[in-house]
């Protein structure tokens, strides 16, 4: 068995492969949204402090709600939890996008919606991690799946803001 095939062996599981691709797209979009929110706040205020505040506000709910989110994921069907949180993220993004598109967005809207997104992420992140283990039949590829999932998360963290920067540069 070659080294490359060992590196990606969890992708031989169809459910994990589909999950991996879908999660890659979703996370790149999430990181693009984070960058877009930062650009929006800076354009609204011209303030570096306000820019820092939007990131802080998004992180506030992660600490207390992550404990609850992990417990919730352990008690409910993970797939259903993920579907609900993805819909909530879509609604949050649509609200923010709609306000910005209509020219009605205020900084407090961005702060509030960032806080709500942080609360949803507190459930989404443990659900994603737990669901990954369900996508690999048998446990011989589980460590590989977890490693690929982690690498993909970090790649999305790099690619998403870079793509958002290109979009902002092109569209304005």
At which residue positions do the language-model features occur?
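Alpha-helical transmembrane-bundle signature of multi-pass membrane transport and export proteins
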Residues: 1-172
């Amino acid at each position: 068995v070659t080294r490359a095939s060992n590196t990606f062996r969890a992708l031989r599981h169809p459910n994990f492969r589909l999950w991996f691709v879908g999660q890659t797209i979703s996370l790149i979009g999430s990181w693009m949204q984070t960058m877009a929110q930062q650009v929006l706040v800076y354009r609204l205020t011209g303030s570096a402090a306000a820019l820092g505040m939007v990131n802080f506000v998004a992180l506030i709910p992660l600490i207390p709600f992550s404990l609850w989110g992990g417990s919730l994921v352990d008690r409910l069907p993970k797939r259903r939890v993920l579907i609900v949180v993805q819909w909530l993220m879509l609604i949050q993004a649509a609200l923010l996008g709609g306000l910005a598109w209509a020219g009605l967005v205020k900084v407090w809207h961005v702060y509030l919606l960032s806080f709500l997104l942080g609360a949803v992420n507190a459930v989404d992140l443990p659900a994603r991690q737990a669901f990954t283990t369900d996508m690999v039949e048998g446990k011989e590829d589980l460590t590989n799946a977890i490693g690929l999932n982690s690498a993909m998360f970090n790649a999305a963290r790099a690619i998403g803001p870079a793509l958002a920067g290109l979009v902002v540069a092109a569209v304005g």
